[in-house]
UniProtKB/Swiss-Prot annotation:
It comes from Sinorhizobium fredii (strain NBRC 101917 / NGR234). Pfam families: Metal_CEHH (PF14455). Keywords: Plasmid. This is Uncharacterized protein y4jH.
Length: 205
C-alpha cells in the first residue's frame, strides 16, 4: 500500500528535485557504469542497471525509488520488472549484491580460493523471505530496511543527514556490490537465463 504524503509536499518535492539534479550532473558517469534514469515524476524515479562488463548486454535490475515524505522518511527502493514496472519476486531478480569481509594482507588469489571453498562468509544486501516474495535492499538508509522489525534498533533518524540513504548513496551501492562486479552471464542447460556472475576476486569489501 502506497505511503501517504504527510510532510509538506513542497518540501519533499524540493528535495526530490535536488537529488535528481545531482544525478543529472553526473549522468554520463553513471551511464558508463550501467545506471540509467528512465523516468522521474515526483515522488517516483525509475532506474535500470546493466553491467558494463557483461556481453550480450542485459538489464541486471530495475528499481522504483519513492520519495514520499523524504527525508523525514528514508527513500523506498522496490525492485521491479523493467517492462511493466511491477514489483517482482526474488526468483525473477538475476542480481545479487555480495560483500565480503575485510581481509587485510590477504592476496587476491587466496581470497578467491577462500570464497570458492565457502571459508569466507559473504553478505548479500538483497534479501527476501522466500524466492516467491519481493526482494528488498537490506541496507541502512533504505525504507524497507528500517521498516523491517529485525532492524527496529537501527532507526532512520540515526542516519538522516549523514549522506546514507540519499539517491547517490543507493545508486552507488547497487553499482558497487551488484552490477559493477558482474562479469559473466550464467546460462542453465534448460536455456533459462540465470543470474549475473561475479568472480570471487571481484567481490568488494
Amino acid at each position: 500500500m502506497p505511503e501517504l504524503q504527510t510532510v509538506d509536499p513542497k518540501v519533499s518535492r524540493a528535495k526530490f528535485d535536488r537529488e535528481i539534479s545531482r544525478f543529472r550532473a553526473y549522468a554520463d558517469a553513471y551511464r558508463m557504469q550501467g545506471c540509467f534514469l528512465i523516468e522521474e515524476s515526483f515522488p517516483s524515479a525509475f532506474f535500470i542497471f546493466a553491467s558494463p562488463k557483461v556481453k550480450p548486454r542485459v538489464i541486471g535490475a530495475a528499481i522504483e525509488i519513492d520519495f514520499t515524505n523524504y527525508d523525514l522518511r528514508p527513500l523506498s527502493v522496490v525492485f521491479v520488472d523493467p517492462f511493466t514496472r511491477q514489483p517482482i519476486a526474488r526468483k525473477d531478480l538475476p542480481l545479487n549484491m555480495l560483500r565480503r569481509p575485510q581481509l587485510p594482507g590477504t592476496p587476491t588469489e587466496m581470497i578467491s580460493n577462500l570464497i570458492q571453498q565457502n571459508a569466507v562468509s559473504l553478505t548479500d544486501f538483497i534479501q527476501a523471505n522466500s524466492l516467491e516474495d519481493q526482494p528488498f535492499l537490506c541496507m541502512a538508509g533504505v525504507r524497507e530496511y528500517h521498516d523491517n522489525p529485525a532492524h527496529s534498533g537501527d532507526p532512520w533518524l540515526l542516519h538522516r543527514g549523514s549522506g546514507e540513504g540519499c539517491l547517490a548513496f543507493i545508486l552507488d551501492k547497487i553499482i558497487k556490490y551488484g552490477t559493477g562486479p558482474a562479469e559473466q552471464l550464467q546460462i542453465h542447460l534448460q536455456v533459462a537465463l540465470g543470474g549475473l556472475l561475479v568472480p570471487p576476486q571481484a567481490i568488494p569489501e
